[in-house]
Design a protein with these regions (language model features):
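Extended terminal
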Residues: 4-12, 17-25, 29, 34, ...
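C-terminal/domain-terminus segments
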Residues: 11, 200-212, 318, 378-393, ...
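Sec-dependent signal peptide cleavage junction
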Residues: 22-56, 153-168, 173, 340, ...
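Flexible beta-edge/linker motif
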Residues: 42-151, 167-189, 193-195, 202, ...
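Glycine-rich, small/hydroxylated-residue low-complexity segments
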Residues: 132-134, 311-333, 347-363, 367-370, ...
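Extended intrinsically disordered, low-complexity coil regions enriched in Ser, Thr, Gly, Ala
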Residues: 150-155, 196-203, 332, 337, ...
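Flexible, surface-exposed loop regions and adjacent strand-edge segments
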Residues: 151-159, 334-340, 461, 504-510
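Interface amphipathic segments
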Residues: 201, 217-257, 262, 266-282, ...
């Protein structure tokens, strides 16, 4: 999209320049002959204007690009200029020469457009060659193909301001160009990765609005402007692509770039599984989670959007998620597949991203997370929800120098467990030792009662809480790829649980009174602390290859709960 603006701006500016220089001494060209449009009379200067524009494009691009115009319609009385069916193509010989001279840009493009319209070219413009003032310009239906290849000799050039080069090339014959507004509508952008020809990125229905464009000596170094525009907004809608495993689609409803702020806003971002739940599960090679993510609004601040589009780098000083839902579903009736790799913790996944990543701050605002699990033994689905999640992750990166500077990613968040109970979590991920997966976690939860617990306990744990209340609970855990250890501390009173059994006839759960009597009489410790004795058991668990990160932590916490309550761990925690 960046090159779309540059070329659109070039077209607009050189079209204006050509129109204003159509006096005899200005319309002379060095090596171009009028093409496509034939002069109807000695007074019809359109072929000469086209030739002049072609010369300017050639000179401005050092011979790389060739401009073709099918039709040019100047209207001096109405102060208008229309360019119909234009094309900018590549001179392959010049491209090879520029590459040999180490002057070829990383992005080479081909543009076709249906119409370019310019308003507000008045008498003042005609009288002052060195100054151009235009009311507005519009470019309709452009199709832009960009062929991207990162060239090592351009690394230093990338540090320079693109606008400076553009200024130097355009301002050789004039002192000032001012355009009130530029509008580009219904554009199509297709990005080709030269190194990976099969990787194609396509954006449809692109809209670009640029206001208060001023090119003169006062703006050539103005970092607050984007391509000399005081304000520039780029938008595209309905961008969709599949994930590499073909299990999901990523859908982005609208992408907006406020260019001078280096700010990208994405509305209605979604990760959707393909097909129905049954169709999705048929594609799996074994038991796995199914994810669905919906984010109404995502804002990336201080981001290099062109590097992001070209998949070269993901850098943002701050990113905000506003609202949204993350749903995770698993089906225990699906057979286990092959053992999963033991390197899929959050910080390990970031390290696997094939491009440099640095998100200094990631904020969540009112996020909702839903975990659902189907248990074939109870023939029911248990659901755990965490709502009103607000928190911050800091220093998300895979860049070695950044890791040496600060070797940790941290995450702190607050939420409502089951829509009611306040809870807080804090994670610390060791980036310097990411291979072993080192991390620590602290979990704190407020009051729990049977109304909150039973919707989870009955379908997933096959027990129901008859009486009891937890006043508070905390867990501190440290671990890696293979083991977790830590402590779990819960304060509760008057605990009484009832095991459940399946009714083979109706598939319903019924109370198992014999087990209930035995459990509450022999095993269950119905309060903690008991007197002055606070049970705070140490916990050590080994990781199952099929466990994800959340299930791994939950196993450790559940083990601590069982030890505190006096329930044999093997009755609750199952190793698969």
């Amino acid at each position: 999209m960046k090159k779309l603006i540059i070329i659109a701006g070039l077209i607009l500016l050189i079209a204006c320049a050509g129109f204003l220089y159509f006096k005899k001494d200005v319309l002379k060209t060095t090596d171009f002959k009028p093409a496509n449009s034939k002069a109807k009379s000695i007074l019809d200067l359109r072929p000469s204007i086209i030739a002049k524009l072609q010369q300017v494009v050639k000179d401005a691009s050092e011979g790389l690009y060739i401009l073709s115009i099918d039709k040019l319609e100047p209207d001096v009385l109405a102060s208008k200029l229309d360019v119909i069916d234009g094309t900018i193509s590549v001179d392959t010989t010049a491209m090879q020469q520029l590459d040999q001279l180490k002057k070829l840009p990383d992005d080479v493009f081909i543009i076709k457009f249906h119409s370019l319209h310019i308003d507000g070219i008045g008498i003042g413009d005609l009288l002052h060659k060195k100054t151009i003032d235009i009311t507005g310009a519009s470019l309709n239906d452009p199709v832009i193909h960009i062929y991207h290849k990162a060239r090592s000799y351009n690394k230093e050039e990338h540090k320079k301001n693109d606008s400076l080069t553009l200024y130097q090339r355009l301002m050789g014959q004039m002192k000032k160009i001012a355009i009130t507004a530029i509008n580009i509508t219904h554009g199509t952008l297709i990005i080709h990765d030269v190194a990976q020809p099969k990787r194609l990125t396509k954006f449809n229905d692109i809209t670009i609005r640029m206001n208060d464009i001023l090119i003169d000596s006062s703006t050539q170094y103005d970092a607050g402007r984007f391509l000399f525009a005081k304000h520039a907004l780029l938008e595209t809608r309905n961008y969709t692509f599949p994930t590499p495993d073909s299990l999901y689609y990523v859908r982005l409803g609208r992408i907006s770039l406020t260019a001078e702020k280096h700010e990208v806003t994405v509305l209605n971002a979604q990760l959707q599984h393909r097909g129905s739940r049954q169709e999705f599960e048929k594609r799996l090679h074994g038991r796995d989670e199914m994810y669905d993510v919906s984010l109404p609004k995502v804002v990336l601040h201080n981001v290099n959007w062109w590097q992001l589009v070209n998949r070269e780098k993901i850098v943002s000083t701050k990113t905000d998620f506003y609202g949204g839902t993350v749903s995770v579903f698993s089906d225990l009736s699906i057979p286990l597949g092959a053992k999963k790799p033991m390197n899929h913790f959050p910080h390990q996944l970031v390290m696997m991203i094939p491009v440099p990543v640095l998100v200094s701050e990631l904020n969540f605002h009112q996020l909702k997370v839903i975990f659902q699990q189907y248990n074939p033994e109870t023939r029911s689905i248990g659901m755990v929800t965490c709502t009103n999640i607000s928190g911050t992750a800091r220093h998300i990166t895979n860049i070695r120098d950044e890791i040496r500077r600060l070797p940790y990613t941290s995450l702190t968040a607050k939420a409502l467990f089951m829509n009611k109970v306040p809870m807080a979590v804090r994670f610390k991920f060791n980036l310097a030792n990411y291979q072993s997966g080192q991390f620590s976690a602290n979990v704190n939860m407020d009051t729990l009662n049977k109304i909150t617990i039973n919707p989870i306990a009955e379908p997933l744990g096959r027990f129901t809480v008859k009486n009891g209340q937890m006043q508070q609970g905390t867990a501190h855990i440290e671990g890696d790829n293979f083991n977790l250890h830590g402590t779990v501390e819960i304060f509760y009173t008057d605990l009484h649980i009832t095991p459940l059994k399946s009714d083979s006839t109706h598939g319903e759960l019924k109370k198992n009174h014999l087990k209930s009597f035995f459990a509450n009489t022999v095993f269950i410790k119905n309060e903690n602390p008991s007197g002055n004795d606070l049970r705070q058991p140490a916990v050590t668990v080994g990781r199952d290859h099929h466990q994800n990160f959340v299930a791994y932590i939950w196993t450790a916490i559940l083990t601590g709960l069982c030890k505190t309550m006096g329930i044999p761990v093997k009755l609750v925690v199952k190793n698969e």
